[in-house]
Regions:
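Active-site glycine/GP-rich loop and adjacent strand/helix microenvironment
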Residues: 1-131
Length: 131
C-alpha cells in the first residue's frame, strides 16, 4: 500500500516486538504537502513541510502561521502578528532556506492569520495548493 506519508525514522532503534524492521519515529506529513521549487541550476528541489515550519521558529513573536504554495514562484504566508519586522524576518528565513537548498526563492505575499474554522480535524501549517 502507498499511503503518501512522509516519515521520520528512528535512528539505531530496535522494534520492541523484536522484529528487525525499521522503526518510525513519527509521521512528518503528507507527500502531497511537500513543496517543489525550481532549482537554481535546473531541475527541482523538494522542500518538506518541517523545513518550512522551522523558518518560523527563528522569528521572535510569531504566535500562529500558515504557508500556502500557490505556484513555483508564489507563497502566501498567513502570520500573527503581521508586522513589518515579522515579515522581514520571515522573508529572510525563507530566502536563507532557498539558498541552503539551492532553489529559486519564490515571491512571498503576507496576509493576517485567521484561525481556520472549517471542519478539518488537524490544522495544517504548510499546504501545497498548486497541484
Amino acid at each position: 500500500y502507498r499511503l503518501n506519508d512522509v516519515l521520520t525514522l528512528a535512528a539505531n532503534q530496535a522494534c520492541g516486538c523484536g522484529q528487525a524492521t525499521t522503526v518510525m519515529a513519527k509521521i512528518a506529513g503528507r507527500e502531497d504537502d511537500v513543496f517543489s521549487f525550481p532549482a537554481v541550476g535546473g531541475g527541482r528541489v523538494s522542500v518538506f513541510p518541517d523545513m518550512v515550519e522551522r523558518c518560523f521558529l527563528y522569528v521572535p513573536g510569531v504566535s500562529e502561521f500558515r504557508v500556502e504554495r500557490h505556484s513555483d514562484d508564489r507563497l502566501v504566508v498567513f502570520v500573527a502578528p503581521l508586522t513589518g519586522e515579522v515579515m522581514d524576518q520571515v522573508r529572510a528565513e525563507l530566502d536563507g532556506l532557498a539558498g541552503r537548498l539551492g532553489f529559486v526563492p519564490p515571491r512571498v505575499e503576507f496576509e493576517p492569520y485567521v484561525a481556520d474554522s472549517t471542519h478539518r480535524r488537524k490544522r495544517k501549517r504548510v499546504e501545497n495548493c498548486a497541484q
